[in-house]
């Protein structure tokens, strides 16, 4: 069985085809980074218009890459939320229309479930149960996962997500959009320990996060110490270390509270090398395992939507003729498969 996946929740147009026997057959991705760079962030209207231009050509390219035709597709999966409402509507409308025209089921997919399941695309996928750290520009959550759709929210950010804090702090440091990866690159040139940032909410019980204060702390540190190149690198290092340590401390608590031995990391920030190294070291000490997707599947992509669509289709999930999206959609509301 082959599923076409369509991802248009924000500023990447991702199209992929997944076969339940052969695996990933095609993966096409277009990033709008250059389109939004001059504005310092994603402009929703521009994102929607660009998805309109790119979605159908990328579907054609994916079919060509897989050497398939429309008649070879058994279902169409699309991101139905959460995300930017206009961007979501583009993918949902195209996906639902193609499913109707091709007389195949349409499958609405939760964007964060796509991220959560992305490590399943690797050669060594995790078994259930596990703790999932979903860490991206819009979300920072710890989830207890005991099966498909069996998700319990353990903790989440009460203000900025980790990825959002990375981007905002990068802007304070004079870095271009998207700033997160550029901040990490700058941090690699920084001196550890010159500046010490707080580890928010680690001095109290619980698994919630707070990252907005780190941005303020960074702004004050820049104002007090100047902004020569080395100082900026040292501040970037201190900021990244604070975020990584905070995530690691909370992951450790989540593992202790659940008793699970496996940790899955997903979302755009999961591509951060420092975070990967620290969590791998922690799990080795705990005699556990850590899993994550390859870097190109950490950010938004169609492959994770095609795979999640396959999983949901086998569980009997399909959409009616209407086009419905949910810009806000708690992961815990998904039914068990």
Curated annotation (Swiss-Prot):
EC number annotated for this UniProt entry: 2.3.1.234
Binding site for substrate: 134-138, 167, 180, 272
A GO molecular-function descriptor: iron ion binding
Cofactor note: Binds 1 Fe(2+) ion per subunit.
Recorded superkingdom: Bacteria
Major localization class: cytoplasm
Location in or out of the cell: Cytoplasm
InterPro entries, A to Z: ATPase_NBD (IPR043129), Gcp-like_dom (IPR000905), KAE1/TsaD (IPR017861), Peptidase_M22_CS (IPR017860), TsaD (IPR022450)
Assigned keywords, A-Z: Acyltransferase, Cytoplasm, Iron, Metal-binding, Transferase, tRNA processing
Record: residues binding Fe cation: 111, 115, 300
Cofactor(s) in the UniProt record: Fe(2+)
Biological-process GO terms, alphabetical: tRNA threonylcarbamoyladenosine modification
Gene3D superfamilies: 3.30.420.40
Family per similarity comment: Belongs to the KAE1 / TsaD family.
PANTHER family per record: TRNA N6-ADENOSINE THREONYLCARBAMOYLTRANSFERASE, TRNA N6-ADENOSINE THREONYLCARBAMOYLTRANSFERASE, MITOCHONDRIAL
Protein name per the record: tRNA N6-adenosine threonylcarbamoyltransferase
